């Protein structure tokens, strides 16, 4: 008997789920049961769903896509065929201050592949170029030497000048004017004073900026704390266009793109990566035009139509993306887009490091009324935005729509502090979810990797 599933991989590929897919494994245990192996930390948990209750599966094609060339070849091809600009080697001629912005330790950008090719391209046009690599930490902590060495390798560490951005170092920040939103645009002095500004990065779905990469190298990458906080204000986060995979009408994206233009970001090199963090697609050139091509490719592999259900199972893709609860909000937003109002999200996240943010934890622990919490966020002026407010606001939004049963290694009290229902196995989570929805004919949608899909409502 053949296995038949109602599942969506992308708009172009429906009902073609492969049993050997590296992200999800299904088998027909018996005629009326499907079994899913779902990422959880460095392990996998099994979810068994009866056929009559399975609404569908939302699965990205990203991790099963096979690139036609190696990552290095893809990046080199992109450098040789830029979109919307001359070649970088030609742009480098005569330039005295060249700055290449690179992502920090929190992003799985394959810089060991990309950066040597970018530097070689610059030096082809300008062998004597004074190049500085600027690490775009945004609001994150500083990147350590060990992390830089792991990112770039020994040759770049030994031979290149590397500076780590500090969003609070006022002596090395420069005011460039007002953003369209009214906030002050303040960025790193090295970036502002460069006569050739380049950025490497990667493109993935982003749960309020639409997509990562491109313009984000400037804002939040090398912007001041004040600028980032204003951009992440509650009004922007509440905007219906500030969602995964959406850039048109997205006020956060609009400010970011304006910032990139104001900073004169001349050239980007961005990749799309697979689960092993290897490039499977690359673009280079104009910070908007090249980024558009990259995000269109990504959307073609990741975009799926919502399958409404009473219960939605999601994950954060396992380690290293499910190390804490704060991180796991991203995977929950994929479920938020397809769960029915008043339904249940079962979120699988090892969360071995706990909550992941002091303010994030305290906000939910100390306020039991989610509507009052949301009002506090929305009443806060953009210039009064505080750290992690955006993540808390998004989390509160989805908790107002659905109950979250959180499968993790966390103590029950911590999970309950964050307004969720604790569970420590898939079986326990399903039983609790069924008790909450109180329906005999409940439907379940499964999202094997909530961070790699763009769910269209």
Model-found features: residue ranges?
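Glycine-rich phosphate/diphosphate-binding loops that line cofactor/substrate pockets in enzymes
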Residues: 83-99, 124-128, 303-311, 339-340, ...
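Histidine-anchored nucleotide/phosphate-binding helix
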Residues: 108-126, 328-338
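C-terminal non-catalytic interaction/assembly regions of soluble proteins
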Residues: 328-329, 333-457
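Conserved phosphate- and dinucleotide-binding cores of soluble alpha/beta proteins
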Residues: 179, 188-270, 274-277, 422-423
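An acidic, phosphate/nucleotide-engaging active-site surface
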Residues: 143-211
């Amino acid at each position: 008997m053949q296995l038949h599933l109602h599942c969506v991989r992308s708009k172009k590929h429906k009902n073609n789920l492969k049993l050997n897919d590296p992200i999800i494994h299904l088998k027909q245990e018996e005629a009326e049961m499907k079994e899913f192996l779902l990422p959880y930390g460095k392990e996998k948990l099994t979810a068994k769903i009866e056929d009559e209750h399975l609404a569908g599966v939302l699965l990205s094609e990203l991790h099963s896509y096979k690139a036609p060339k190696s990552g290095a070849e893809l990046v080199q091809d992109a450098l040789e065929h830029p979109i919307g600009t001359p070649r970088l080697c030609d742009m480098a001629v005569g330039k005295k201050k060249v700055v290449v912005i690179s992502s920090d330790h929190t992003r799985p950008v394959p810089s060991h592949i990309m950066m040597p090719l970018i530097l070689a391209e610059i030096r082809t046009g300008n062998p004597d170029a004074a190049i500085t690599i600027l690490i775009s930490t945004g609001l994150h902590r500083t990147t350590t030497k060990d992390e830089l060495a792991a990112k770039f390798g020994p040759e770049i560490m030994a031979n290149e000048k590397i500076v780590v951005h500090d969003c609070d170092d006022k002596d090395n920040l420069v005011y460039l004017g007002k953003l369209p939103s009214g906030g002050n645009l303040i960025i790193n002095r090295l970036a502002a004073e460069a006569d050739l500004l380049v950025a490497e990065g990667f493109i993935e779905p982003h749960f309020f900026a639409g997509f990562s990469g491109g313009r984000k190298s400037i804002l939040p990458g090398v912007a001041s704390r004040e600028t980032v906080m204003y951009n992440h204000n509650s009004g922007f986060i509440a905007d219906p266009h500030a969602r995964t995979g959406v850039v048109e009408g997205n006020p956060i994206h609009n400010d970011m793109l304006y910032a990139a233009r104001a900073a004169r970001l001349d050239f980007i090199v961005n990749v799309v990566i697979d689960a092993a963090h290897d490039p499977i697609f690359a673009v280079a050139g104009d910070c908007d035009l090249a980024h558009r091509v990259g995000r269109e490719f990504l959307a073609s592999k990741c975009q799926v139509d919502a399958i409404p259900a009473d219960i939605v199972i999601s994950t954060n893709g396992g380690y290293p993306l499910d190390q804490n609860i704060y991180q796991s909000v991203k995977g929950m937003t994929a479920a938020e887009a397809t769960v029915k109002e008043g339904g249940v999200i079962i979120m699988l996240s090892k969360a071995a490091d706990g909550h992941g943010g002091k303010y994030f934890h305290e906000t939910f622990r100390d306020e039991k009324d989610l509507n009052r919490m949301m009002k506090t966020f929305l009443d806060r002026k953009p210039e009064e935005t505080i750290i992690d407010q955006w993540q808390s606001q998004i989390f509160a939004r989805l908790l107002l729509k659905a109950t979250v049963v959180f499968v993790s290694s966390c103590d029950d009290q911590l999970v309950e502090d964050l307004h969720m229902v604790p569970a420590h196995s898939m079986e326990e989570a399903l039983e609790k979810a069924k008790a909450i929805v109180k329906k005999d004919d409940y439907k379940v949608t499964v999202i094997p990797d909530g961070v790699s899909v763009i769910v269209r409502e």
